[in-house]
Amino acid sequence: MKRLLLSLFILVTHFVYAQEVPDFPDMRSWMINSNDSDRYVFADTAYVRVTPDTKQAPLDTLFAGDNITVSDVTTNGLTIRGLKGPWLSINYIRNGVHKSGYIWQGLVSCKPMRRGDVKFVYGIERRADSIYRRGKNWDTIPRFLVKLKVIRNGTILAKATLTTYDDESANTSEGKVMSGMGLANVQNIVVLSFSGEACGIPTLDYYFAWTNNNQLVRLSNKMNVVDAGSLDHSETFTFPNEKNGKPDRIIWNMINEEASDKIDKHGEYIMEVTDKKTTTYIWDGVNGTISKSMQ
């Protein structure tokens, strides 16, 4: 009897807790939980509050690229620029003094990236839904506007934007900084990835070139979709410093595979190539531009 009562108590406790914790689906790409998480300030200017709301005057002011540590995610929500998100409890250092307070999650970066003293700070700026007509009706395609900022010693050197779908492909996001990959006048290639990390959900990769003269140039995108044992849509880039690479060329390769009626020795369907394409992009390192080859 005691064991039954204990089980019921645990179930009720979990149910009540689940009811109390609000869902913030707009914030899923940040991948922030209640564990300590090191992030940057994403907004150009962000106010730190003494409580998780805007009722009190700002406690402090932080700027894009400032380091913070998220210690907790509150249940208090706020909607700004069409994005609903929680207030975060944060710790940070200002002029050598350890401080704490609250900041709205939309002012905080997604995954932090840096190379040396240069920080690559990205986050979702606002909603960017598009409306289109289908027959007699108007439909909405939910989208996010994502902004990438390059910051050195507190100074924003460059900004660039992209729009990505607000669907299952935005369940997670990652960022990585690569070398210039052999492109002339390029310090780094920055890749922002949005994915659902599940079968049949696209992974969308957005590429940027960070040049030696501090330009942030949008390159092409690629998409990959895998549905195990059924289909495989693969897109890859070949850069100049990679095998089969060409000077100042980015080669896009696409292969579609689908399951055939044939079975291998492990009982799995054999995949067959159904489509294959290649496109070459020309990089102009002098002007910092990219164009599609007409050949």
Q: Where are the language model's segments positioned?
A:
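Terminal domain-start segments
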Residues: 20-27, 34-38, 109-175
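Short beta-strand elements that form the blades of beta-propeller/WD-repeat-like
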Residues: 118-142, 186-199, 244-256
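Bacterial Sec-dependent N-terminal signal peptides
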Residues: 1-25
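Boundary regions of SH3-family modules and the immediately adjacent low-complexity/disordered segments
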Residues: 20-36, 82-130, 207-219, 225-227
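Surface-exposed loop/turn elements that mediate protein-protein interactions on large endomembrane-trafficking
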Residues: 147-168, 207-223, 280-291
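Short aromatic loop motif centered on NTY/YTY
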Residues: 178, 194-196, 203-204, 216-295
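Beta-loop motif signature
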Residues: 21-81, 91
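Short, solvent-exposed loop/turn segments at conserved positions within beta-propeller repeat blades
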Residues: 81-83, 137-144, 199-203, 271-276
